[in-house]
Amino acid sequence: KLYGYLNRRARVLIPSPSYSIHSTHEAFHANSTPLLYHLDPARGWLPDPDEIRALVREHPEVCAILMINPDNPTGAVWPREMVEAVVEIAAQNDLFVIADEIYNRLTYNGRKPTLLAEVIGETPGMALKGISKEYPWPGGRCGWIEVYNEDRDREFKRYIRTLFDAKMVEVCATTQPQMTIPRVFSDSRYPHHLEARCAAYEKR
């Protein structure tokens, strides 16, 4: 749905390597090959902002830049200055930012991700979040979108409204996981559960 409701000519820059759902669905939407910027293993699997700028110049159809932070599949945690660089590129070119932050509470070795909400400023953007990776409930799935600065851009606002309207008419909502979220997230034991999981990952 995220890509299917974009303007048919609009494209999203996708990191490579990438979680295949993003690249394949964006390419399917555009009926073309994905527009990719590269994550360089020599740079700790981080992108080159200059490459992103060049791709934006070469492809005026680009409407957004996707970040996956922490990254899947590389595991890289983007430093604050890299997230800020992507937001700056988006702001300078009237784009919006998509941040897949599904793993944001599952990091280790002392590394913490910079969330899009911390640096987005007045640039339109959205963060994709959910419980499926961190919840102590195998098969429990529920995701949501945090939207920033919806009113700053008319086309972005229309796109967001379309996404939300489409979700309202879908069946099979994840009702049970939704009902548990307030209780689990407010439980004093939950942060310790996450810390223990991250510590176990660090030892492996």
For the regions a protein language model found, what residue spans apply to each?
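Hydrophobic residues in well-ordered beta-strands that form the structural core
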Residues: 14, 36, 97-99, 181
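Active-site phosphate-binding strand-loop segment of PLP-dependent enzymes
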Residues: 39-112
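Conserved coil-to-alpha-helix start sites within the AMP-binding
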Residues: 18-23
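Phosphate-binding glycine-rich loop
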Residues: 1-11
